[in-house]
Amino acid sequence: MTELFIDGAWVAGSGPVFASRNPGTDEIAWQGESASAADVDRAVASARRAFAGWSALDFESRCAIVKRFAALLNERKEAIAAAIGRETGKPLWEARTEVASMAAKVGISIQAYQERTGEKRQDMADGVAVLRHRPHGVVAVFGPYNFPGHLPNGHIVPALIAGNAVVFKPSELAPGVARATVEVWKEAGLPDGVLNLVQGEKDTGIALANHRQIDGLFFTGSSDTGTLLHKQFGGRPEIVLALEMGGNNPLVIGEVEDIDAAVHHTIQSAFLSAGQRCTCARRIFVPQGAFGDRFLARLTDVTSKITADVFDADPQPFMGAVISARAAAKLVDAQSRLIEQGAKPIIAMTQRDPRLGFVNAAIVDVTGVANLPDEEHFGPLAQIVRYATFDDAIERANDTAFGLSAGLLADDAKTWEHFRRTIRAGIVNWNRPTNGASSAAPFGGTGRSGNHRPSAYYAADYCAYPMASVESTQLTLPASLSPGLHF
């Protein structure tokens, strides 16, 4: 089994065999050997050798290869979407949008690099000031399972455009998607060693993160893992560390005219991708009183009709399975703990089959929980908080160490102005789902949600460092000398 990609060739790993499974059927989706520490070392060494030639290649030539990659993605959309669905449980309709986002990332990243970095010149009295941007060198990219194509692609594409070489460690739950993506890069003509793939579980990740020859690490994943990485690199200022982590995201519901629109946006916020988006709403703030009761009744009615099925079902479901049977069981356990603390189930979550990742979209009222845990439950588990005043809702919405996304559904512009001024989050939406984001804007959050904007439009900022120069084409003695100098 040759599942590692090192120095332009598919090779076998020397670590333990592991497998990924389709969470909707429990069938093996991929199997292969993991990368040992020695394999990781070879991958990093390959990237280091390739870096000099790749970074010396002119910008237009690098972009030509990356554009070819985008074109091939579009040609292979169905095959890659099927790979995504098979390993993650994501329905095909949604997996197709992920592949489309991967291709669109190329044009956005090229534009961002030119606008936010590139080269700038300004005349001076005795020369010219030049600002250029240089790639860091070898960067490690750690990908998550929820968007195994799109999210690592959001690191890899801008890193390559800037001239870096990459060692890619995907989630052990979605290695097949990573292989399919790297195959497209190879066909696009990427030079040997510029992109290397190391498959594996925890030990592979540790070997890569600890490697002394990486110049940067770009991570998307859980807050717990990201925090450990932050501690690990605390004494290494030479490493550029970009972390995009999770959120305990609030959605505040105002007394709106169109209750169905509010319910739709709430369901999209809480249950899209089976709740496995870092920007999904975890806490739904609903006003006390008659309007809140009507909203909650309608939300319950529509949510109870949401279907979950295998990724390629016909007709297509709104939700697929969550990433694994283990993840499904953890979500049910999280619900049980909330109920023990005083939460009231409105729609209780159950796991359909202990071997599979199917859970239903669930709603629990946590208003009566005295000390609500500040935790991200990564799945379709919506927590309802009833509020008395709008300021009370904002205060409780901000009562989190995270700060990724937040949303307000309200008809009044003044209410929105107050909300956006006082809420604490990196992505703040009005009358749109919390997981709606523009690729033309930075993506990321505050607090425990991350330390940079490691994807979307600001990705260029951390893929290259600024190099300032003062230049003159001629070496001449100044017309006026400093005091004490005699020529």
From Swiss-Prot:
Catalytic reaction list: N-succinyl-L-glutamate 5-semialdehyde + NAD(+) + H2O = N-succinyl-L-glutamate + NADH + 2 H(+)
GO molecular function list: succinylglutamate-semialdehyde dehydrogenase activity
Coiled coil: none
EC number in record: 1.2.1.71
Residues annotated for NAD(+) binding in this entry: G221, S222, S223, D224, T225, G226
Gene Ontology biological-process annotations: arginine catabolic process to glutamate; arginine catabolic process to succinate
Enzyme class: oxidoreductase
Pathway: Amino-acid degradation; L-arginine degradation via AST pathway; L-glutamate and succinate from L-arginine: step 4/5
Pfam families: Aldedh
NAD among keywords: yes
Alphabetized UniProt keyword annotations: Arginine metabolism, NAD, Oxidoreductase
Active-site residues (renumbered): E244, C278
UniProt entry tagged with the keyword NAD: yes
Physiological role: Catalyzes the NAD-dependent reduction of succinylglutamate semialdehyde into succinylglutamate.
Family named by the database record: Belongs to the aldehyde dehydrogenase family. AstD subfamily.
Name recorded for this polypeptide: N-succinylglutamate 5-semialdehyde dehydrogenase
Source species of the chain: Burkholderia lata (strain ATCC 17760 / DSM 23089 / LMG 22485 / NCIMB 9086 / R18194 / 383)
Annotated gene: astD
